[in-house]
Amino acid sequence: MNKLIETLASLNLSGADTKIIRLDENSYKLESNYGYNDSYFQYDVHYYDWMTAEVDVDGNIFSAVRKSGSEFWNGGGEMSEERVVNFGDPEWKLPNEAKEAVLKNANKILALQVGEFVEFDRDGNHKIEYISASAGRIGLQK
């Protein structure tokens, strides 16, 4: 397996929507974000987990930040909890089940030109984009 794809797959979060951008001839950026709302008793809760990372074409991690936490609120006040972890070790791997989403898109990722990106959901399916009337077309485009 290509080391770049293996590293991007290791950084991808379970359950997340992911965007991989070709920054320049030597690097890629991964944005993997997941969040959901829940409620119990009198509280509303928002849970989130996101990863932003830059990786070179050889699969070495330049930088990676994982931020996760939760926000609670009700009529009487708010609480929040957040954890931030910074990574710079080229051998670091995030254990998760989300690798298949990146592997499914390996050919698209490797074909990216500078400034291009590919976006996919937690199952690795290409995201549907909305086209506005100003673009001359209205509706959904795959």
Cite the ranges covered by each PLM segment.
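Short intrinsically disordered terminal tails
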Residues: 1-3, 79, 135-142
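Acidic, low-complexity, intrinsically disordered interaction modules
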Residues: 27-135
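Negatively charged, low-complexity tracts enriched in Asp/Glu with abundant Ser/Thr
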Residues: 2-38
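Generic N-terminal leader/processing signal
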Residues: 1, 17-20, 65, 97, ...
